[in-house]
Amino acid sequence: MDAIKKKMQMLKLDKENALDRAEQAEADKKGAEDKSKQLEDELVAMQKKMKGTEDELDKYSEALKDAQEKLELAEKKATDAEADVASLNRRIQLVEEELDRAQERLATALQKLEEAEKAADESERGMKVIENRALKDEEKIELQEIQLKEAKHIAEEADRKYEEVARKLVIIEGDLERAEERAELSESKCAELEEELKTVTNNLKSLEAQAEKYSQKEDKYEEEIKVLTDKLKEAETRAEFAERTVAKLEKSIDDLEDELYAQKLKYKAISEELDHALNDMTSI
């Protein structure tokens, strides 16, 4: 009988232990379910955060693309300005060649003037014996008049050529002004583009703190921005070089204008001298 009671007590104790274990298992189950729910909520929040990060990356990728397009436009404008400068250089070369040819004509005119003066001297000496050589001297004077007229015509033609060169220089000045305006516009666009690139750089840096998973993409974008910044500096350098070239061309044009003015004065003096010589021979 005592053994049965003892057995009953042991069974009762086992039952209580089993109930305690069941309650503990139920509590563990509930804790596991709560932990699972928490992890699911954290996963959903993380997915939303990553989705927002991806959207921002897409947005900044578009901004970077716009910056690249603007940089390409700035480089194209700088290239156009350099092409305009090269065209002006060619025009200056043509003007200088025309000036050289005009100087050659001037030398020819001076030579003919010297010949005409010598002929006039010979005519003056011939007038001393005009009674014996009247017909011969008249023919010689007529020939000298023809030579003087030809020399005057050459001088007038050279003067006309110089006026044409002056008109060309006026046209070149207009072209230079337009090239300078283009260079200034290119410099302004480069400055605007640099500000936009700075904004993109700041935005990309702030994106680094949002998700480590996208750090490699951000590094790539920063490298692209560095390349774009280098290209922008190169475009600015080209624009500055174009401005310096325009200034040099303007100086060359000023020098050519001064030389042109001096040559005109020289031609005017020669023309007046020819007129005086012609008048002197006519009066003789």
UniProtKB/Swiss-Prot annotation:
Pfam families, A to Z: Tropomyosin
Positions of region (Disordered): 1-40
GO MF terms, alphabetically ordered: actin filament binding; identical protein binding; protein heterodimerization activity; protein homodimerization activity
Annotated Gene Ontology cellular component terms: actin cytoskeleton; cytoplasm
Coiled coil: 1-284
Intrachain S-S bonds: none
Main location: cytoplasm
Record family assignment: Belongs to the tropomyosin family.
Domain remarks: The molecule is in a coiled coil structure that is formed by 2 polypeptide chains. The sequence exhibits a prominent seven-residues periodicity.
Function (record text): Binds to actin filaments in muscle and non-muscle cells. Plays a central role, in association with the troponin complex, in the calcium dependent regulation of vertebrate striated muscle contraction. Smooth muscle contraction is regulated by interaction with caldesmon. In non-muscle cells is implicated in stabilizing cytoskeleton actin filaments.
Assembly, per entry: Homodimer. Heterodimer of an alpha (TPM1, TPM3 or TPM4) and a beta (TPM2) chain.
Full protein name: Tropomyosin alpha-1 chain
Organism: Rana temporaria (European common frog)
